[in-house]
């Protein structure tokens, strides 16, 4: 790949540099050199247009003859067999009619016959992939084949590499475990190719989206060791993914993405047909229907099984009735795309940008989902064939579909050329001059500006057709709306204060006029210094009157204060006109922004810091009555996070961190907005914030594990998907009591036996592996990006605190808690619970926790320890501001109630087992009542006081302040809590 210095070279200079490197390549033979010199000019041209091709041939000079001579011969043969794009489109749904599959399979089968080990398999697959992709690149950059042929060849090669690897691994696993059986016949796992692979329209440098499934449960037969079908196919899937995905000295075959499978990363790698059917019937979502349109079985090992599988997927994808709900789903997906473009600033992206490849795909797929149940012609996997069918069925005019086909193929050619330059999955136009030169040479343009003009026109046409499909009407103002006229005058004219007062005399009080005028004038003065271009200035001039209009119409209290918050948001987004457009084009979004800024300075500041949150106002889900079941909330977050992360490359750590932070910010805004809109009960705010953190933690752990596994392998004692690792939540996370901005108290545990190491090329002792895993998790959580920190974390509650290991063995944890822990550490353990990890290890933790909390304790000594710790905390943490109240640390505050709950557990668990069941204060008090430790009246008063104090604490955060004002109501609550404290602890509390 070219360096920064090389980026300043022309593409011709790049080509000459590559030619000299080729001539001095260690593996170059005289025959290869002679062939290369014979084709010097054509090779130099190809090198100038693709550094991937040049570097591949330098590394493997023997590819020269196969790339240059055999490719030219092959092109002549194929031209006679494939006369037109129409024939290619007919072939696309029938693998057997594609000559490329037969050609590739024949050659790869010969290669794989000599492969004996998995390492040899990986090498053979990569060498064959590189050889054939070099041939495709050579033809493409010299324009010796059209883009339709190139797409089909790349897809056929993927099919063959996938099935070749699959069958080799299947046969070798069968030697050890036997074969899965179904009525006496060998049973296979079926590989569903999704997306462009399914449609035989694969990118040159693409990942592949797969789903694995097999017919039925059972056990293998005929091997040295029989195992369940699920185990067999899971092992097969894992080895297949590794064979394709692993990066070796020879590169990678494909990046494999399994996130489209049922339940995403949290789901099993392989599912039997019945489980697959249950999932899509009960839980399949709209976006999964879009994805399933292109699903294709890659390995047709048993036609009856494939029919069975298709009979499951077909009714989910294609409804028997006209399904116009698809358009609503498409509108939502359009908004997601627009959101992604804004957040990732993808303005030069030919796939995701407005009028990009994705919009053509959605255009075709939406009609497939609406009409496909009744029109078999619309069930094709091929986008081009689908567009033809839309015209044949009189659904879309021919001039529209022909234009879309032409424009789509133009964009695919651009995409292919971009990716063939360096074999990188990119759809973004290049910045470097040599890459721009290479691009326009292949595309046939005289200059880059001419190419950009053609590209802009192409994408504008596509975007126009897409918008016609999903357009929605917009609100407008009446010409007689006097308030709106006043708002326009206030912004557009340089009104003096007296004129401003007269203009708004019928709409605002004199006090509000006095407050609003200087704020508006100051903002207008600032705005003159903004360098936002004519379009940005025009948008701002249209938007400001709308803001004033909505603000005055809503009659908020403290109107000048709300305007100041609103203009703070506008100032933050002035340089990003897409967000100004968002507010201008969506009146409901603007109305919601005004409401939220009125009710919460914290929300206003969050939106100011992270303008991406404006996208959440497009669909204000927080306005409806919220689900309050904690398990349902968690499931909803899991599904939404899965959908969010599908848009991010698995190996892009920076985008992973940004995606998680964006997800958290958006969900946290929804919770806060629900809170202040009173659509979410106060005691459920913490529930939602807590399960949100759990879901994000699970994803972070899985991502960190994947990164560690790629580098070091996994500890050798593990089987299947086990990690031998667990995350324990303490404090507010453990007690289901997270607030806005709470940090996470975490402890990491593992259960690896002594002497175990990882099985990767770079092996580590298991303890070191788990410490590095913990460090990786902390990095993903703590790193500050443009979107802030995911969570601030605190590991000081682990055994031995900061002096202890970052990840402790479960046996060491138990020994420490039994022999060394202080009373305050056992208090902390009351609020600890298992968050995520291996089931067996989580059960071990729960057992240890119960054992420790149930120890026999002297109640008087315990009370003394608890009181001393409380006084010590108050001395260090209580605010010295006597005019305000620190709700957490004050006498009769939140922490006093928490300490009382912890004392009740530690003092009584030895005689009342149930006291260790729950980690949260409210249920601890309920349990204490059932165990007759405290009376119902006391429990009820403490619970009500706790909820009231927490409610106030949440609202202080939303008001962006730390301490509460003194009030009679607050004094009464604190006095009541203090009395219960004195009753429980007596003289030791003094």
Swiss-Prot record:
Involved in the regulation of glutamine synthetase GlnA, a key enzyme in the process to assimilate ammonia. When cellular nitrogen levels are high, the C-terminal adenylyl transferase (AT) inactivates GlnA by covalent transfer of an adenylyl group from ATP to specific tyrosine residue of GlnA, thus reducing its activity. Conversely, when nitrogen levels are low, the N-terminal adenylyl removase (AR) activates GlnA by removing the adenylyl group by phosphorolysis, increasing its activity. GO terms for biological process: regulation of glutamine family amino acid metabolic process. It catalyses: [glutamine synthetase]-O(4)-(5'-adenylyl)-L-tyrosine + phosphate = [glutamine synthetase]-L-tyrosine + ADP; [glutamine synthetase]-L-tyrosine + ATP = [glutamine synthetase]-O(4)-(5'-adenylyl)-L-tyrosine + diphosphate. Belongs to the GlnE family. InterPro entries: GlnE, GlnE_rpt_dom, NT_sf, PII_UdlTrfase/GS_AdlTrfase. Keywords: ATP-binding, Magnesium, Multifunctional enzyme, Nucleotide-binding, Nucleotidyltransferase, Transferase. This is Bifunctional glutamine synthetase adenylyltransferase/adenylyl-removing enzyme. GO terms for cellular component: cytosol. Its cofactor is Mg(2+). Pfam families: GlnD_UR_UTase, GlnE. Gene3D superfamilies: 1.20.120.1510, Beta Polymerase, domain 2, Nucleotidyltransferases domain 2. One of its GO terms (molecular function) is ATP binding. The gene is glnE. It comes from the Bacteria.
